[in-house]
Regions:
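Structural alpha/beta surface segment adjacent to cysteine/selenocysteine redox centers
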Residues: 1-63, 145
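C-terminal cap of thioredoxin/glutaredoxin-like
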Residues: 47, 51, 55-150
C-alpha cells in the first residue's frame, strides 16, 4: 500500500512526512513488514495496549526495526513490560485475531485508508503523521482539556 501511494521513493516520502510533523524517522526496512502479529500482541497487553503499540510504532518508524519478525515482537513486548511466555503464546496461535479484524473493519468504516491513523472518541479520524498541535485542536474541539505537560 505504501509503495502504491508514494511510488518507488517511498522511503523519502515517509521521511519527509515525519520531518514535517517534527517526528523522528529511521531508515525503514527494505520490505514493509506485516504488523498483524505485533498488533495481536499489543491487543493482548490490555491496559498496556497504548504503551506497547507506541513501542512497535517507534521500533519501526523511529529505529527501522522489522516489526513483522517474531524476535523483534518479543523483544519490544518484554521491554514494554509483558512476559516472554505470554507473548510467545499469542504468537503461537490466532489469539486476538478476531479483535484485530473487527477493529480494522471499524477503522475502515470510519475512513482510515492506511497507517498511521488515529480514531479519537470512537469517530474522529486523524490520518497520517501529524504534529502534536493537531491532536490538541481535535481534543479541544471534542471538549477535552489537553494535559498541561503536552
Amino acid at each position: 500500500m505504501l509503495l502504491a501511494r508514494y511510488g518507488p521513493d517511498m522511503q523519502a516520502a515517509v521521511k519527509r512526512m515525519f520531518d514535517e510533523a517534527g517526528l523522528p524517522a529511521a531508515d525503514l526496512p527494505p520490505r514493509v513488514p506485516n504488523s498483524r502479529r505485533a498488533q495481536r500482541v499489543a491487543i493482548s497487553a490490555g491496559e498496556r495496549f497504548g504503551q506497547l503499540y507506541r513501542r512497535y510504532s517507534e521500533a519501526y518508524f523511529g529505529r527501522g526495526r522489522d516489526i513483522g519478525d517474531d524476535e523483534v515482537i518479543v523483544e519490544e513486548a518484554i521491554a514494554g513490560g509483558l512476559d516472554e511466555e505470554s507473548v510467545r503464546g499469542v504468537l503461537a496461535g490466532d489469539a486476538y485475531l478476531d479483535v484485530l479484524l473487527s477493529e480494522t473493519q471499524r477503522a475502515i468504516e470510519t475512513g482510515a485508508t492506511g497507517v498511521p491513523a488515529w480514531i479519537i472518541d470512537g469517530g474522529v479520524l486523524v490520518p497520517g503523521a501529524q504534529p502534536h498541535e493537531v491532536f490538541e485542536r481535535v481534543l479541544e474541539r471534542l471538549g477535552h482539556t489537553p494535559a498541561a505537560d503536552g
